[in-house]
Amino acid sequence: MKKWIVLALTVTFWGLAFTAIKYSVRFLSPIAIASLRFAIANTLFAVIIILGKRIKWKDLPKVFALGIFGVSVYHVFLNLGEVYISSGVASVVISLAPIFVLILSAIFLRERITYSKVVGIIIAFLGVVVISEPSYANIYGIALVMVSTVAAAIYTTFGKSLLSKYNPITLTSNAMVLGSIPLYPFLPDSIRSLGGDLNLIGSIVFLGIFSTFFGYLGWYYFLEKEEASRASVFLLAIPVVSLLAGNILLAEPLTLRTVAGSGLVLLGIYIVVRKR
């Protein structure tokens, strides 16, 4: 029972992250949101680094490079994308990450792609076409978030070799701290621009503590209790949370195009990640 509570909280934290970002980009720059988010999260991740297993010096450059993609590139482009598209659509596009992991693994790690997975990939990208309304802002926003999706896939694909040496929490904590180094120079101006808006401050704190720190801890706790291939299916609930939260909290419209396109994306991803 405990693992399902943890999963429900994790999915909720990650789903609401897109809503918090969409609210925050009304007042802060995309880089400011990312720098503030990780200033908070890294304070907690630093404790894990201090208490946990040390990353070997020879592995630090790879962890740093992975972190650049998984933190700086991923979050800045996601925040940029949400300037132009709704939080719900952003979460649907991000959910394509397993498909890019599959493609990158096939290219660089020589992992096999089955016929059913090819069908899933086609269905998922058809879904993206459906939700891509014919406007410059919408297409541009989706393209920006797609960069984040590819960055997340790079982080996951090329981080596989390090998971044989380090546990996921240790690796993630170091990648978060090292990967956000390019964001640190923007922190002083970001703090000044934050002001005294309690709703905005609450959104940033939520992103740093709950969506980032507790989100990852919860996910890895669940992975210890559940098979990874089955666990990944539950991540399909994240866009559902984001779409509903965006509609309820930010009055984002749930159009037929959005619902139909999202449904196709999630169906395609399910076909890709399900265990045969």
From Swiss-Prot:
Q: How does it sit in the membrane?
A: Multi-pass membrane protein
Provide a GO CC annotation, any one: plasma membrane
On whether Transmembrane is a keyword of this UniProt record, the answer is yes
The cross-references to Pfam families, in alphabetical order and at most eight, read: EamA
Keyword check for Transport, yes or no. yes
Give coiled-coil spans as residue ranges: none
Please provide the record's keywords in A-Z order: Cell membrane, Membrane, Repeat, Transmembrane, Transmembrane helix, Transport
Top-level taxon in the UniProt lineage? Archaea
**Can you tell me where the transmembrane regions are?**
5-25, 31-51, 63-83, 89-109, 119-139, 142-162, 168-188, 200-220, 231-251, 253-273
The family database entries (InterPro entries) matched by this protein are listed as:
Alkyne_AA_exporter, EamA_dom
Where's it found, cell-wise?
Answer: Cell membrane
EamA domain boundaries: 12-133, 150-274
> Which family does this protein fall into?
Belongs to the EamA transporter family.
* Listed name of the protein: Uncharacterized transporter AF_0266
Q: Which organism is it from?
A: Archaeoglobus fulgidus (strain ATCC 49558 / DSM 4304 / JCM 9628 / NBRC 100126 / VC-16)
